[in-house]
């Protein structure tokens, strides 16, 4: 506890201004007692004090009781004192918020009320800024409290008597307890500026806060997803068979000597972690080792289990994963990010005893089953997402979670320090274990949802392009082609002409078309890959920016583009935010060209609805019919039923229509037939 010197009373120092030490934390607090007026105090926040301490002159005598166990406290001069009086369950009101303190001890320290470290821990995360501090109520509600630059002590002889209701006793003069004196008030600003060394102080406090963040992170990180010192084992799951009488068996696989050696190592590790155990289950699924590019990055093979048969036989979990576009809208406009990855997330979810036999697998070492949710079960992502949503839903204004990925986003560093602290505190509270090596703190650029998010732009991570370029020009079968087209679809927002680009390849996947890969197909693959040498960073539209969609249609395809108008120093700049394209269905190919243009608008709005609801936007098209179509009054002619439905659907949106000349519709260039034929 700090040792404070009392200064002269205010009446004796009329020409002296007193300022608190810049490293001291004084805040306003208020106490209420029956029969007394409100008692306003300048409280000292002392993280070095283990207890909350108050003067006997600020809490009425009838509220003090003898402590069950008197405590001995060592003070600054090295001597010890015994504290025997305590006040229990006191309410301290700070900026209108009630903070309940279980115990306050009585001791004369020269300060009315000392808020000790037990209070800071009870309402953590506690964060200090240059001009304020933050306590957190109920683990989720941050309370911002301004620091005092001048502090006084009111608790002297006669103070409580003067605070009784209807008392006519004059209140004693407050005693100034500020520790820095300024003899000339005119010099206050200059001396404060010099004394605080604001830039250095800010750096020092930032370092302190970063250190606190690192300490919080360390508390919740481990290489063991079931670390007994950190897990609370609160995540539980149950899996059930559709037909409980049926045993699900898949015959074992054959293994090479090298695979057997690798299994020896991995099974031992899993047993040591206590995530698996020997099994007598009637069910059986084969385990095998994967050695693809993603696993090479880990430096070794990884054991996986083929649960295809079990997944067909068990009841699914319909809990939805978050929509990725919705998550991206949450973080738009934010300036600073931190991201965290749950350590082997699914393994932090314990299976009940009845479910464990369903996870049984075979390998060279024998028959085992999981104590936790294993990777490969169809229910695993939904089970984990439900638990994570339950834990972090209260923080949705600055945190989003996609399965085992957690992202924290803020407008500035000060807010971010608080936000990160609250998330880490919640992880600590629930025993959610994070990976230290995958944590990214206080970044302007992060990877999330397979995207690089940087300064208001986004694009696919580099490995997406690497996968595309590493695909062979000659494909072996339909499965390999499906994987290639799947990667293209993943990056569809960044490829303006994807529908027509993939159509010749998509046609080879039809059920009635036998597999055949020709020289022309190889040339076409080379052409596709050549045209995908990089993805442009696209703009992430801010809520206040006006949005535009531009559309166009050809005989077989439609395309759309989302743009935003960014105003910078009075200049309007149109920035591309997303691309989408598609092919018309067989029946739609017979529509009139005007209807195809209308359908292109509708399809584009559907794709970008997350951004276009509920805002007023602009539709830009080179089709002269669409503007009049919106205003036409159809009277129920059955031949025009499609148009009536389209009008009704469009009426749910607020937009203007701008017609542009075909020569000015640069987006139409993206719908060229360049990819329809190899030799075009």
UniProtKB/Swiss-Prot annotation:
Q: Which UniProt keywords apply?
A: Aspartyl protease, Endonuclease, Hydrolase, Nuclease, Nucleotidyltransferase, Protease, RNA-directed DNA polymerase, Transferase
Molecular-function GO term, any one: RNA-directed DNA polymerase activity
What's its catalytic activity?
DNA(n) + a 2'-deoxyribonucleoside 5'-triphosphate = DNA(n+1) + diphosphate
Instruction: Name the EC number(s).
Output: 3.4.23.-, 2.7.7.49
Q: Which residues form the active site?
A: 46
* SUPFAM superfamilies documented for this protein: DNA/RNA polymerases
Q: Name one GO biological process term.
A: proteolysis
Positions of the region Protease? 41-131
Q: Where is the Reverse transcriptase domain?
A: 273-453
What Gene3D superfamilies does the record point to? Answer: 3.30.70.270, Acid Proteases, HIV Type 1 Reverse Transcriptase, subunit A, domain 1
Query: What job does this protein perform?
Result: Encodes for at least two polypeptides: protease (PR) and reverse transcriptase (RT). The protease processes the polyprotein in cis. Reverse transcriptase is multifunctional enzyme that converts the viral RNA genome into dsDNA in viral cytoplasmic capsids. This enzyme displays a DNA polymerase activity that can copy either DNA or RNA templates, and a ribonuclease H (RNase H) activity that cleaves the RNA strand of RNA-DNA heteroduplexes in a partially processive 3'- to 5'-endonucleasic mode.
UniProt record similarity statement: Belongs to the caulimoviridae enzymatic polyprotein family.
Give the domain note. The polymerase/reverse transcriptase (RT) and ribonuclease H (RH) domains are structured in five subdomains: finger, palm, thumb, connection and RNase H. Within the palm subdomain, the 'primer grip' region is thought to be involved in the positioning of the primer terminus for accommodating the incoming nucleotide. The RH domain stabilizes the association of RT with primer-template.
Protein name (record): Enzymatic polyprotein
Q: Which organism is it from?
A: Cauliflower mosaic virus (strain NY8153) (CaMV)
